[in-house]
Amino acid sequence: MSLHAFIQQANQFGEQRQPFFFLIDFEQQQPIICPLAQAAELGLFFAIRGQQNVNWQTEMPHKPFELHKFPISKAAYQRGFDLVQKELQKGNSYLLNLTYPTEINTNWRLEQVFQQTTAPYKLYYRDRFVCFSPECFVNIHHNQIYTYPMKGTIDATLPEAEKRLLDSDKERQEHYTIVDLMRNDLATVAEKVEVTRFRYVEKIQTQKGAILQTSSEIRGDLAENWQARIGTILATLLPAGSISGAPKEKTVQIIHAAEQRPRGYYTGIFGLFDGESLQSAVAIRFIEQVDEKLIFRSGGGITILSELEDEYQELIQKVYVPVG
């Protein structure tokens, strides 16, 4: 399905108040949309803030979760990092989300990871990938659209971790940039856009311990009958600013040059429309089945203040599964 066809179908479903599920890849080449009741038939199983379509129960894992990481070398990461830094220094980008795959071994199957992880937005695409995302893309209800850009993480066990996170010049600049980008994005589809919460801290539990992350809340007003434009609204906002960067169009070109491989559904979006409201997520925290291997996709925001070692370690730190 083309993106144009997706937009038309989503707008039609929205106008009819027909509940539907959708999934759009980062490159916007393989969008999927279907009536909500048909998602399971396509092998798409979701659990999104209390709404889920899982009609099966996988056997409980017999052993505690184990995860072994085999990240790319620092030299391989540095090639992409250096390319990005050159573009930042030229002023072609101010913030860029650089991602790479990490091969992993685990004693759980993808469907077990899906059922046992804790995250507000979960998706299992049978035999293809599992996603357990903490990050909202946009939520729409009562004619208001919300987004919650998430930028800035730190190991929660470090001394004064929250203070270090909030006081970091690099993390502050990164967060200001993404909030400004997302505020401008929302202004293309909504009115009276405002930041209603700025840089609040949340804790996420992982199998290796807790991490802290900072988010903000941005809100705008939509016109009546926005449901009839739901596909147009989603497409206008793509790709998600938090996993691309600013300015968006040029930054995406740099991403393709640095990463040298398509992201596919990783860092795309997925969600559901229940007939009145929409909930959606950015497809991060993502394990993909590639032939006989499992690949965990992760990354982080790069600014001109970024240090190679810090960013390389963040890439590895984000390879985690929120279980237990």
Curated annotation (Swiss-Prot):
A single GO BP: L-tryptophan biosynthetic process
GO molecular-function terms, A-Z: 4-amino-4-deoxychorismate synthase activity
Pfam hit, one: Chorismate_bind
InterPro entries membership: ADC_synthase, Anth_synth_I-like, Chorismate_C
Domain of life the protein comes from: Bacteria
Family: To the C-terminal of para-aminobenzoate synthase component I.
Record protein name field: Uncharacterized PabA-like protein PM1464
